[in-house]
Amino acid sequence: MRISLKLEPQSGILKIPIHYNHILQAFIYRSLDRALADWLHEEGYRYEKRRFKLFTFSRLRSKRRSFDRSSGTLSLESPIFLKIGSYETQILESLAIHLVKWGEARLNRTVCRFASIEVEMRVIPKGPLLVRAISPITVYRTLYGTDGKRKTYYFTPWEKEFQELIFDNLKRKAISIYGDENKLPPLDNAY
């Protein structure tokens, strides 16, 4: 399930650092029921030593935007669009209720009015599925060099490990939801 937000900054323009994911993540946590936000942030869905939040969000989209290299900021003209998705409908329900109640939010010290909040219902696929990512997918592995120092290797989509690691990550997340690998559907030839 997904929520699509249409935001209108009071000034008509939202200025935000180029690396703004933490700002959106904080906005999402602040917009949830406090107990749910605390549980999600501190606990989440567990798989071995990992904790998954099981929500995602797109980049901010705007028809007109500019980048100021000297300050490292993006200027996004109204309207601005954001999609937030989650497997867990409770997260999106809590988010939607609070956003409708408040009617506006502050992003990077700019007040933004919610012009619309739309719920996109979950589509249950039948057969093969082509997925289009609306934000970049980063796949990496931490390795150790001959000197013993940790190094992060980022895979490209053209490397075999890229899709294998994505699939393994999805499988871990599914197990964190269902609690047991035996409850998952058969995954033969899934990629």
Describe the role of every protein-language-model region.
Residues 1-191:
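RNA-interacting cores
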